[in-house]
Amino acid sequence: MTEEATTTLSSADIIEIMKLLPHRYPFLMVDKIIEIDGDNTAIGIKNVTVNEPHFTGHFPESPIMPGVLLIEGMAQTAGAICAKKDGQPGNLVYFMTIENARFRKPVVPGDRVEFHVRKHKQRGNIWKFHCDAKVDGALVAEADIGAMIVRKDQA
């Protein structure tokens, strides 16, 4: 990706997301990125459907999206910011830390989750983000996460 492309991308469909992230079904937790503001903020979207494999066991009679997958959606949205800024195809963004995770409300099939991520620190290839997950504007989960860009020849 050119420097111009990395700074002008304002949103990303699933094809662009798959260029930025190595994740694939069933572990790609972001369907679309509706907003990217440089390397500072992004909003990712996950459309939750009952057809997702985790709902067969979590929980069959009352399906609830596992909290760890909400965290993963936040991390993938943050990872898209890192990968976009890095601009080097093939490099990986590793999820390093999670702090202050809180789950406020259940997320169920039919919900549209928005992952709001905001960079609050970057030093070299280490990034720190504050993340919120929202459904219909209501906070359902939040966490502070850390990520690291790893060159493909060092992965």
From Swiss-Prot:
EC assignment: 4.2.1.59
Subcellular location: Cytoplasm
Keyword Cytoplasm on entry: yes
Catalysed reaction equations from the record: a (3R)-hydroxyacyl-[ACP] = a (2E)-enoyl-[ACP] + H2O
Keywords attached to this entry: Cytoplasm, Lipid A biosynthesis, Lipid biosynthesis, Lipid metabolism, Lyase
Function per UniProt: Involved in unsaturated fatty acids biosynthesis. Catalyzes the dehydration of short chain beta-hydroxyacyl-ACPs and long chain saturated and unsaturated beta-hydroxyacyl-ACPs.
This protein's name: 3-hydroxyacyl-[acyl-carrier-protein] dehydratase FabZ
